[in-house]
Design a protein with these regions (language model features):
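Reductase modules of NAD(P)H-dependent flavoproteins
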Residues: 2-7, 142, 146-241
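Ferredoxin-reductase
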Residues: 2-93
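A short, basic/flexible loop-to-alpha-helix module at the beginning of a structural domain
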Residues: 101-112
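Conserved S-adenosyl-L-methionine
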Residues: 113, 136-143
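Conserved beta-strand elements of the Class I
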Residues: 117-119, 206
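Ser/Thr-glycine-rich phosphate-binding loops at phosphate-binding pockets of nucleotides
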Residues: 121-125
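Histidine-anchored nucleotide/phosphate-binding helix
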Residues: 127-136
Length: 241
């Protein structure tokens, strides 16, 4: 089966932290894409030496469903010397690119347990933003969103996460590892998760972002007798090429 391919045009490219930009691409051909919240898309990028490279980014659209969407929003961190981040950070609106997808299984399942932990660092919270409208309606499940960053200025989409956390069954835990701020947990996301006492009998966890965080939290959950199917993982690897 052929992988769906799309021609897209950059609509907006704006900084949302000192090191992260938000990009919105409009679908040109075909005009729409169907995806599941939590999935990602890939871009084929041409480089100066003519060798194409592929980079993947989680869909951050915040919609009631992912059917027939006319745009794709994602966030990207700057990697010094990274060809992909240089290209995207400097891309001007109107730039045309080729996109494939959607891919990935980091999606909420039809049946959910008592508690769901959504753990992310940096741009690894993008798929959780796309799940916000699902969280609103799945009132039988208690959601805990854990967002890890070094400093408060490194965080984004805060208004969206705080808004959904006004609901009784949704909780937002911003975690800062390098500074103390009111309303934020001081420490790493794995430390906050441990405080919440995850239980394999009633909970599942989603992990996305820094590979070291993903591995450390996965080991912690395994020590608590979580099975592989109870922990969904997606690592973000930052490449300079």
């Amino acid at each position: 089966m052929a992988i769906p391919s799309y021609k897209v045009r950059l609509e907006t490219n704006e900084p949302i932290t000192p090191n992260v930009r938000k990009l919105v691409f409009r679908l040109e051909d075909p005009k729409t894409i169907t995806y599941k919240q939590g999935q990602f898309v890939s871009f084929m990028l041409g480089t100066e030496d003519g060798r194409p490279i592929k980079r993947s980014y989680s869909i951050a659209n915040m919609e009631t469903d992912g059917v027939d969407s006319t745009y794709i929003e994602f966030v990207i961190s700057y990697v010094e010397g990274g060809k992909a981040s240089e290209l995207f950070f400097n891309a001007e609106p109107g730039k045309e690119m080729e996109m494939t997808g959607p891919f990935g299984l980091l999606c909420l399942t039809e049946e959910l347990p008592k508690r769901v932990f959504l753990v992310g660092t940096g741009t690894g919270v993008a798929p959780y933003r796309s799940m916000i409208e699902q969280m609103r309606t799945r009132t039988d499940t208690e959601f805990h969103i854990l967002f890890g960053a070094q400093y408060l200025e490194d965080m984004f989409y805060l208004d969206d996460f705080k808004a959904v956390a006004l609901l009784d069954h949704v909780h937002f835990h911003p975690c800062l590892s390098r500074e103390e701020k009111p309303g934020c947990f001081s420490g790493y996301v794995q430390h906050k998760l441990a405080e919440l006492n995850p239980n394999p009998e009633t909970d599942i966890a989603y992990l996305c972002g820094n590979p070291n965080m993903v591995d450390e939290v996965f080991e912690m959950l395994k020590d608590k007798d979580f099975g592989v199917k109870q922990v969904k993982r997606e690592k973000y690897v930052f490449s300079r090429f």
